[in-house]
Amino acid sequence: MSKDDLIQFTGTVLELLPNATFRVKLENDHIIIAHTSGRMRKNRIRILLGDKVTVEMTPYDLTKGRVIHRH
């Protein structure tokens, strides 16, 4: 699967979970579990409750995603 196959959504962080994982409410009112991308971990970008984030998801599993940007 290439990068072109990934779907991006904007959402809001609802809950902070262990191991850099978050419960995110997307703009289409779906709630998913998302983890922090490797570059965000490497650069120590903090994500807090209520932050607007961009989430990248695969079309095969629409319940999990990866946070790639914090607004």
Curated annotation (Swiss-Prot):
Molecular functions (GO terms): ribosome binding; rRNA binding; translation initiation factor activity
Pfam families for this protein: eIF-1a (PF01176)
GO cellular component: cytosol
UniProt cross-references to SUPFAM superfamilies, sorted A to Z: Nucleic acid-binding proteins (SSF50249)
UniProt keyword terms in alphabetical order: Cytoplasm, Initiation factor, Protein biosynthesis, RNA-binding, rRNA-binding
Annotated ranges, domain S1-like: 1-71
Cellular localisation: Cytoplasm
Family under the similarity heading: Belongs to the IF-1 family.
NCBIfam families: infA
Function: One of the essential components for the initiation of protein synthesis. Stabilizes the binding of IF-2 and IF-3 on the 30S subunit to which N-formylmethionyl-tRNA(fMet) subsequently binds. Helps modulate mRNA selection, yielding the 30S pre-initiation complex (PIC). Upon addition of the 50S ribosomal subunit IF-1, IF-2 and IF-3 are released leaving the mature 70S translation initiation complex.
Protein name as it appears in the record: Translation initiation factor IF-1
